[in-house]
């Protein structure tokens, strides 16, 4: 695998000499591009803040395109494995399970036709949650969404919530389906190699800090940033598989990391967004489970789960990093949900 520094050096040197497989879109002038991104961010904020209010129906008609497609729900695995598949729209259903639910927007990033939003979900478990009876316990988890917009309307969205953290906070196990099956997320082989993403980013020479910051972050898929790449006060506030690491540390096997457990690990890129110093990268962690993972014995199964990194790059140096992966999806692929949840 190429080193991070070689990826970054080669990419910055390549400039406009690299070519995309598809046609290029003519970029908007800088001022128009900023205004367009700000409008898109406002639409996504409207989408979120109207949820659970009397204005929700009108707001959804206002902000969603007629052909709106939700590629992934936040509570994806619990919904897929629900005991009763007859629940209504997932948003309404979740508000029934948590009638005092509040969502707090923590971060928004806008880059052209795409917007990313990180929000915090809090509430009290008062109703049935996909087969989990009420526990009266509070929850406090994070969820994020990545949106695509056209003509001021949301055309696509992708969500991921902290489902493993949710189950841990409720002290609950994965509810059994009526047919006895477990719905496991597929391994699709999707996404794009980091080298291809770097080439795509460099069809036109990077014109400012956001574009260069994208390159810096994507190049980190070749190797973790070195001490020289990080600011003196660099902080990583969360690892992608945080709950599994906590589980492993509690059992004295904290060194059995995801990278050690997947000796052929090869991440693939789905999205990179940048605004100012902020960069979001959505990627797939993929490989064969050939080593122990925080006490989970090797299964030799192929795995592929999404992860999102939220970074801040200042003057070319890594300043902050926060990662969030689909830990419940990984456990489903390894058939290890019951082992971790007890």
Predicted regions and their residues:
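C-terminal and inter-domain tail/linker signature
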Residues: 2, 9-20, 28-342
């Amino acid at each position: 695998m190429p080193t991070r520094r070689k990826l970054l050096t080669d990419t910055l040197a390549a400039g406009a000499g690299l070519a995309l497989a598809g046609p290029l879109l003519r970029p908007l002038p800088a001022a128009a591009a900023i205004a367009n991104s700000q409008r898109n961010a406002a639409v996504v904020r409207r989408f979120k803040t109207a949820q659970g209010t009397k204005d929700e129906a009108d707001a959804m008609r206002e902000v969603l395109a007629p052909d709106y497609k939700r590629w992934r729900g936040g509570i994806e695995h619990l919904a897929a494995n629900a005991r009763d598949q007859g629940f209504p729209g997932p948003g309404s259903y979740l508000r029934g399970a948590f009638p005092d639910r509040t969502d707090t927007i923590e971060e928004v990033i806008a880059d052209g036709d795409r917007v990313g939003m990180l929000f915090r979900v809090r509430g009290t478990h008062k109703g049935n949650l996909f087969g989990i009876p009420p526990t009266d316990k509070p929850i406090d988890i994070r969820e994020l969404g990545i949106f695509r917009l056209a003509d001021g309307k949301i055309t696509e969205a992708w969500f991921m919530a902290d489902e493993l953290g949710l189950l841990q906070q409720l002290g609950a196990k994965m509810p059994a389906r009526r047919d006895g099956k477990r719905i496991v997320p597929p391994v699709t082989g999707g996404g794009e190699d980091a080298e291809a993403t770097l080439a795509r980013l460099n069809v036109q020479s990077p014109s400012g800090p956001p574009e260069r910051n994208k390159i810096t972050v994507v190049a980190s898929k070749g190797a973790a940033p070195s001490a020289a790449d990080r600011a003196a006060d660099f902080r990583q506030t969360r690892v992608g598989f945080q709950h599994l690491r906590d589980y492993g540390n509690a059992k004295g096997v904290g060194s059995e990391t995801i990278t050690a457990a997947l000796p052929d690990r090869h991440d693939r890129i789905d999205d990179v967004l940048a605004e100012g110093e902020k960069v979001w990268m959505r990627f797939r962690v993929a490989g064969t489970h050939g080593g122990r993972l925080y006490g989970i014995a090797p299964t030799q199964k192929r795995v592929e789960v999404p992860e999102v990194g939220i970074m801040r790059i200042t003057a070319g140096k890594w300043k902050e990093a926060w990662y969030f992966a689909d830990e419940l999806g990984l456990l489903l692929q390894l058939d290890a949900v019951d082992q971790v949840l007890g």
